[in-house]
A protein has these predicted regions:
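Beta-propeller blade signature
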Residues: 218-226, 275-277
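Repeated scaffold domains used in trafficking and secretory/extracellular systems
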Residues: 182-188, 239-246
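Surface-exposed loop and turn segments in beta-propeller and other repeat-based domains
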Residues: 168-181, 290-292
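Hydrophobic beta-strand segments that make up the repeating blades of beta-propeller
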Residues: 200-206, 256, 260
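Bacterial N-terminal signal peptides
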Residues: 1-6
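N-terminal signal peptide c-region/cleavage motif recognized by signal peptidases
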Residues: 8-10
């Protein structure tokens, strides 16, 4: 469960810059996120129109003034491809380098131009699209986000579901959500019910009436409806998330617990188990206890 959370000005401290270019004749997109913690590091995603699958980049140490070689996580245990950028400067207007086959050493020239910088400083305004890396056989996802200069939190106003087969948008969900401090992780994916396609959750965006501060809450859940072939919100899951803790098993079972279910004397915690039938229905299955 992700509960209510006030986003502070430091929450947007990881700037992400998107770039576009071509690899041969194929359009490609690269997003690089800079994390200043632990001496500095880069992460992000790689996207090629030939596959239409945003793939995460391996988090890689980076020191200003040095070149960057960053693996594409096409294989989580043994990446086969990397992006080499030399020279490299974080947030640069243009990048050049190559796509490297790590098995053969073959390199393909790569030239990229900056599209949008989703800035870390409150002084920076921005507007643009960010893909959300996840493996799904049918779809990929993007969010449209904007922030005015001086604002603390960037706002997402649309979530787009795009066909991997055609590259065309099949659904656009409008609303108000917070852009995550790492913008490429704004959508959190998982299997929330027994359906092969990915479901996702996202943090809402609301302004406090008393002080005007932005709150990134509540958590919203979107589940794929096979009958309607669209993603739909699940209000019951959202209420459970407000009341306690949620977790999901690989089989699509939802498990719920709350403070009242904890027995500190016996060091046990009760969990109620549910099956998600549709984006509107839950079925209670049973309860069980776990020791802690």
């Amino acid at each position: 469960m992700v509960g209510l959370g006030l986003i502070t000005p430091t929450a947007q401290a990881n700037p992400t810059t998107t770039y576009r270019g071509t690899l041969g004749d194929t359009p490609v997109e690269l997003a690089l996120t800079y994390d200043s913690q632990y001496g500095g590091g880069m992460s992000g995603y790689w996207f090629s129109e030939s596959e239409r699958l945003p793939m995460a980049l391996e988090s890689t140490p980076f020191h200003p003034g040095s070149a960057l070689l960053i693996n594409i996580m096409d294989n989580p245990t043994l990446p086969a491809t990397a992006v080499s950028l030399q020279p490299f400067a974080e947030g640069a207007a243009a990048l050049q380098g190559s796509l490297v086959d790590l098995r053969t050493g073959t390199q393909q020239p790569l030239q990229l131009q900056r599209v949008t910088r989703f800035g870390g400083s409150q002084r920076e305004a921005f507007e643009g699209e960010l893909l959300q890396p996840v493996f799904d056989r049918d779809f990929y996802f993007s969010v449209h986000a904007a922030r005015k200069a001086g604002e603390e939190v960037a706002q997402v106003d649309s979530i787009r579901v795009i066909s991997r087969a055609t590259g065309k948008r099949v659904q656009e969900i409008s609303g108000q959500w917070c852009l995550s401090s790492v913008g490429t992780r704004t959508l959190t994916f998982g299997h929330f019910h027994a359906e092969a396609r990915m479901d996702f959750q996202v943090q809402g965006y609301r302004v406090g009436e008393a002080d005007g501060r932005v709150w990134c809450s509540p958590t919203q859940y979107y589940l794929y409806s096979r009958d309607l072939r669209t993603y739909r919100r699940h209000p019951q899951l959202e209420q459970f998330a407000v009341d306690g803790d949620l977790r999901f098993s690989p089989s699509g079972q939802m498990e719920f617990s709350k403070q009242d279910f904890i027995n500190y004397d016996q060091r046990t915690r009760r969990w109620d188990y549910y099956r998600v039938i549709t984006p509107e229905r839950l079925e209670y299955l049973s309860s069980g206890e776990e020791r802690f």
